[in-house]
């Protein structure tokens, strides 16, 4: 099993999530622990090359894989790709 960590930005994003999304995030983080057998994952392109995302309704969990999984951002889909 792999370790899943949240960046400081992702920790702050998590605190701002609606309550129901926090429960769904827990499920997503559990799925990420079973890397590489993660369903619903998509590799990203352009400025997010090297990162992947999992959809959580209208929210996106952006992460990258190094020796473990680092969740970089957790944002609404209308905001996450603007950076």
Predicted regions and their residues:
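Enriched for short, Lys/Arg-rich terminal
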Residues: 1-12, 16-23, 38, 56-59, ...
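A short, surface-exposed loop/turn module that caps and links secondary-structure elements
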Residues: 30-54
């Amino acid at each position: 099993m792999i370790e899943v960590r949240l960046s400081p930005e992702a920790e702050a994003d998590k605190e701002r999530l609606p309550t129901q999304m926090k429960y769904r995030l827990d499920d997503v983080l559990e799925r990420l622990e079973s890397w590489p057998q993660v369903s619903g994952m998509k590799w990203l392109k352009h400025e997010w090359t090297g990162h992947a995302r999992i959809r959580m309704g209208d929210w996106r969990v952006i992460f990258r894989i190094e020796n473990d999984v680092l969740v970089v951002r957790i944002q609404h889909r209308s905001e996450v790709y603007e950076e």
